[in-house]
C-alpha cells in the first residue's frame, strides 16, 4: 500500500472533520445528553418521592381509619352505657312512682277501713241501745246514749 497524496488529504480532511465535530458538534450533543440524563434522574427521584409520599399517605390514611374506628367503637360503647343508664333511671322512677301509688292506695284503704269501722261501731252502738231499750222497755236519754256508744266503741 502506497501512501499517496490522496490518503494524506483524506487523513487531513478527516482530522479537520474530527476537530470541527469536537469543537462545534460534540459540546451540544454532550450538553443534550447531560440534560437528558439529569431529566431522567430528576424523574426517577420524583417517582421515588411520589412512591414514598404515597406510602406515607396510605399509612396516614390507615392510621386515621383505625382512629376513626376506635372513636366509633368508643361512641357506640358510650351510647350503650347511656342507654342502659337511661333505662335504669326509668326503672327507678317507675319503682318510686309505683311505691308512691302503693303507699297512697294503702293510706286510702286504711282511711276507708277506719271510716267503715267507725260507721260499724255507730251502728253496733245504735243496735245495742235499741236492743237495750227493748229489753228494758224504757227510753234512754240522749246523753246516756252517747256515753254508752262511746264506751262500746272504745271496747270494740
Swiss-Prot record:
Gene3D superfamilies: 6.10.250.1580
Main location: membrane
Spans traversing the lipid bilayer: 12-32
Gene Ontology CC: one annotated term: plasma membrane
Pfam family, one: ATP-synt_B
Recorded topology in the membrane: Single-pass membrane protein
Keywords linked to the UniProt accession: ATP synthesis, Cell inner membrane, Cell membrane, CF(0), Hydrogen ion transport, Ion transport, Membrane, Transmembrane, Transmembrane helix, Transport
Alphabetized InterPro entries for the sequence: ATP_synth_B-like_membr_sf, ATP_synth_b/b'su_bac/chlpt, ATP_synth_F0_bsu_bac, ATP_synthase_B_chain
Location within or outside the cell: Cell inner membrane
A molecular function (GO) term: proton-transporting ATPase activity, rotational mechanism
Oligomeric and partner information: F-type ATPases have 2 components, F(1) - the catalytic core - and F(0) - the membrane proton channel. F(1) has five subunits: alpha(3), beta(3), gamma(1), delta(1), epsilon(1). F(0) has three main subunits: a(1), b(2) and c(10-14). The alpha and beta chains form an alternating ring which encloses part of the gamma chain. F(1) is attached to F(0) by a central stalk formed by the gamma and epsilon chains, while a peripheral stalk is formed by the delta and b chains.
Matches recorded under NCBIfam families: ATP_synt_b (TIGR01144), PRK05759.1-2 (NF004411), PRK05759.1-4 (NF004413)
Family under the similarity heading: Belongs to the ATPase B chain family.
PANTHER family recorded: ATP SYNTHASE SUBUNIT B (PTHR33445:SF1), ATP SYNTHASE SUBUNIT B', CHLOROPLASTIC (PTHR33445)
Biological role: F(1)F(0) ATP synthase produces ATP from ADP in the presence of a proton or sodium gradient. F-type ATPases consist of two structural domains, F(1) containing the extramembraneous catalytic core and F(0) containing the membrane proton channel, linked together by a central stalk and a peripheral stalk. During catalysis, ATP synthesis in the catalytic domain of F(1) is coupled via a rotary mechanism of the central stalk subunits to proton translocation. Component of the F(0) channel, it forms part of the peripheral stalk, linking F(1) to F(0).
HAMAP family: ATP_synth_b_bprime
Name of the molecule in the record: ATP synthase subunit b
Source organism (scientific name): Pseudomonas putida (strain ATCC 700007 / DSM 6899 / JCM 31910 / BCRC 17059 / LMG 24140 / F1)
Gene name of the encoded protein: atpF
Amino acid at each position: 500500500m502506497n501512501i499517496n497524496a490522496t490518503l494524506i488529504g483524506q487523513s487531513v480532511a478527516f482530522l479537520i472533520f474530527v476537530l470541527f465535530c469536537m469543537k462545534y458538534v460534540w459540546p451540544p450533543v454532550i450538553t443534550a445528553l447531560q440534560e437528558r440524563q439529569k431529566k431522567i434522574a430528576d424523574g426517577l427521584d420524583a417517582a421515588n418521592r411520589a412512591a414514598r409520599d404515597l406510602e406515607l399517605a396510605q399509612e396516614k390514611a390507615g392510621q386515621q381509619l383505625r382512629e376513626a374506628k376506635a372513636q366509633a367503637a368508643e361512641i357506640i360503647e358510650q351510647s350503650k352505657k347511656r342507654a342502659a343508664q337511661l333505662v335504669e333511671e326509668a326503672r327507678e322512677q317507675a319503682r318510686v312512682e309505683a311505691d308512691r301509688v302503693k303507699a297512697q292506695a294503702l293510706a286510702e284503704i286504711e282511711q276507708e277501713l277506719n271510716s267503715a269501722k267507725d260507721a260499724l261501731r255507730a251502728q253496733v252502738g245504735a243496735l245495742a241501745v235499741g236492743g237495750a231499750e227493748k229489753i228494758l222497755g224504757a227510753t234512754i236519754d240522749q246523753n246516756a246514749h252517747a256515753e254508752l256508744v262511746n264506751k262500746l266503741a272504745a271496747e270494740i
